Design a protein with these regions (language model features):
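Bacterial N-terminal signal peptides
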Residues: 2-10, 14
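N-terminal capping/linker segments that flank leucine-rich repeat
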Residues: 12-91, 95, 112, 133, ...
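Leucine-rich repeat
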Residues: 68, 90-93, 109-114, 132-135, ...
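Conserved hydrophobic beta-strand positions in leucine-rich repeat
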Residues: 72-74, 96-98, 115-119, 136-140, ...
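Consensus "Asn ladder" position of solenoid repeat domains
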Residues: 79, 101, 122, 143, ...
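Canonical leucine-rich repeat
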Residues: 84-85, 106, 127, 148, ...
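Short, conserved beta-strand segments of beta-strand-rich sandwich/propeller modules, principally
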Residues: 306, 385-389, 469-473
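C-terminal outer-membrane/trafficking sorting elements
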Residues: 416-487
Length: 487
């Protein structure tokens, strides 16, 4: 214990007694005499220095000195400092943290020992780090720098440029890069083909139209949302855990190599079909506002999987199981055209063991089909050319009502649905509509506008109904229908 105390005292004595590098202290003193960001104050006052003519450099906050009286570290972040900081020629300086100040220039020329620089949140308009060949960490986010050359910094592993007006950036000589941030720039293109060790990429809020991160086998997180992407290549990204690509213009996305994928926010694109069957660990998918109508899930999805898929084109039959849905309503109104005697919505009839309910309207008037069988419908020929509205509900998805606008065309045959044999028969005589059947049968009679005007129940034999002259549709309980003229 005594030996340790003696060593510490000896080191302290050497630090106090050592001469500090005259060139470095002169450059620091010049900076300290400049105006600070706080009005009416100088930089030296922000650091608690009383007199720049009598500075005890060993006690100045944030400075670390090494052998020969050379600076090895400067930690001056968030001090309300301002002006021009010239550190050129500080060839022992390894760490510089001067972020969150109001610096207007920063010179690091010939500082070849630098490995770590944080100068973000300042007012810098240019930076030259071409002589900082050992630099590993550099962050200059939220300044005003339009160009930066990092081709002379092959040891960079961390690079953050966010919030600067870059349009292009050359990463061709940064093979060790593992984290790259360039959010809220003006990037129009970026090439990652020579950065095989990347684990995290953030290029959100730029002007990118294409992005290729294929074969980045170590990539775990990709943030590329809020761009103009029409193409995104993630082939070979076998370690990708999170892909945030929402607010783009994507029409397709191949995730077949992304087996590790867990988190996938993709809303506000134009992806009609999405296949995540190759992603067994996916636990969050957000696809709102894509016009999506198909979502293919893994064979055995995680029980914790949550899906947000409202404002798309899903039908009941295409929606994922309710247990996975955090939100799913509304879905887009659908438009179809069909012959009046063959409207087929049977795909939505039985979903998750629940039977759907169909409600038909012509404007605000409810319409009863002349025939209805498990989601297949027939309507009077007189409705040809009209557009009916069908609302479909299903108890399996209680928050959703599907709406179809169905334009009816001419029937495919004069007889809506022809029976397989001559029985039962429907005909008219002297103002009577007559139904004949050898077995119990119910006949509902409609006008051509779909208004029901009567019901006949036939036990065996014949039943009749007096009607005004006209053309009628008779819907029989055996699933067939007839047209008949009453005179």
């Amino acid at each position: 214990m005594l030996l340790a105390v003696m060593v510490c005292l000896t080191c302290a004595a050497r630090l106090v007694g050592q001469p500090f590098h005259a060139g470095e202290t002169a450059q620091l003193r010049a900076f300290l005499r400049q105006n600070a960001a706080d009005e009416g104050r100088k930089n030296f006052q922000q650091l608690g220095i009383a007199d720049t003519n009598a500075i005890d450099w060993a006690t100045v906050t944030g400075l670390t000195w090494g052998p020969g009286g050379r600076l090895t570290a400067i930690i001056w972040n968030d001090k309300y400092l301002a002006g021009d900081l010239d550190l050129s020629g500080f060839d022992s300086l390894r760490v510089l943290r001067c972020q969150v100040n109001n610096l207007t220039s920063l010179l690091l020329t010939r500082d070849s020992a630098l490995v770590h620089v944080d100068c973000y949140d300042n007012l810098l308009t240019r930076m030259d780090i071409t002589t900082n060949v050992n630099l590993q960490h550099f962050c200059c986010r939220y300044n005003r720098i339009a160009t930066l050359d990092v081709t002379h910094n092959p040891r960079l592993t961390f690079l953050c440029l966010s919030g600067n007006p870059f349009t292009r950036f050359d990463l061709s000589n940064n093979p060790l890069l593992t984290e790259f941030y360039a959010a809220k720039c003006s990037l129009e293109e970026i090439d990652f083909s020579r950065n095989p060790l990347l684990k995290l990429v953030s290029v959100r809020s730029n002007k990118l139209k294409r992005l290729d991160v294929s074969n980045l086998a170590n990539l775990q997180q990709l943030f590329c949302y809020d761009n103009q992407l029409t193409e995104l290549n993630v082939k070979g990204c076998k370690s990708l855990l999170r892909l945030a690509a929402y607010d783009n213009r994507l029409t397709r996305l191949d995730l077949s190599d992304c087996r590790a994928l867990q988190n996938l926010p993709l809303y506000n694109n134009a992806i009609a079909e999405l296949d995540v069957t190759a992603c067994p660990y996916i636990d969050f998918i957000s696809t709102m506002n894509n016009g999506m109508q198909t979502l293919k899930l893994p064979l055995l999805p995680l029980k914790a999987l949550e899906i947000m898929c409202e404002s798309n084109r899903f039908t009941f039959s295409a929606l994922p199981k309710p247990m996975y849905l955090r939100s799913y309503t509304p879905q887009a109104r659908r438009t179809i055209t069909a012959p009046a005697d063959r409207v087929d919505l049977s795909s939505e009839y039985t979903v998750q063991s629940a039977t759907s309910v169909y409600t038909w309207r012509d404007g605000t008037t409810e319409v009863t089909p002349t025939q209805s069988h498990e989601g297949r419908f027939s309507f009077p020929a007189a409705l040809s050319g009209r557009t009916l509205t069908c609302e479909v509900t299903n108890a399996a998805y209680p928050k959703l009502t599907l709406t179809y606008d169905v334009t009816l065309t001419a029937p495919t045959a004069n007889v809506l649905l022809v029976a397989n044999d001559a029985r039962p028969t429907v005909h008219s005589e002297r103002g009577l509509l007559i139904v004949t059947s050898e077995r119990p049968l119910t006949a509902r009679v409609y006008t051509l506008t779909g208004v029901q005007v009567g019901t006949l129940r036939v036990q065996r034999g014949e039943a009749s109904l007096a009607l005004p002259p006209g053309l009628y549709i008779v819907s029989l309980s055996d699933g067939t229908a007839r047209k008949v003229v009453v005179e």
